[in-house]
């Protein structure tokens, strides 16, 4: 029954009932007591079992997707020294003026922590984001009467996927929605605390808009999937964090981003990473489809009856 409950509470009908019970202005919330008053339609055990199987299969596909992505990360680790250096015993660093401010323009002590020097040494590269990547930072002005898929920070998943993107009329878009993306590009969040929010733009979101809070890049030397895994790797994430600056909103500037070290990856390894990431994304898409089928089946059962819902699900299974 618990899996059916998950499907029901996520379907559009239940969400409307939840919204109706939500109260408050500055911080709308749903009280436990109000949640208990939301009606739950009941059906046969056979229907519950079908919905449960869909949810369980969806969870299994997500687990398989995550495993594929972890394998891609391991492929990258095999070519780059990514030993965990967070436990380094050296916590002090002495730098002369010529080695510090006159070179980097930075006076904050955090920037010169030895751990960052360790990561730079581990990458063993003279290349940077500037030499290996193309940066797309030209503003796009949306048309008022055209709908655009708008990718926000909250739409970026842990494995570099994008989901739950809303379509918004150009006139209703926020002023920061000024980057138009295309398939094969990678977006990287620029604000400290969200640097791990990197995503690969797939065909589904080609032509979408994203916030100016993302850097949009691709590369002539590194395929999109490998670029995604690289930017989400521990050394690159550490170097992104090192280069952040600011007071109210700490972020990495364009100059700091472009000058950040970035290693090349062997073509044979890139191909293997690309295959695993593509497989991961495909499995995640299948998982999402099963969840949608479960939610839609519950909606049909409520609106038209359980028999109609079961028939609809059989048709969906026949399509697979």
What spans do the regions from the language model cover?
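Short, surface-exposed loop/turn microsegments at beta-strand edges and helix-strand junctions
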Residues: 142-148, 166, 179-181, 200-212
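Non-catalytic DNA-recognition/assembly elements of restriction-modification systems
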Residues: 44-142, 266-320
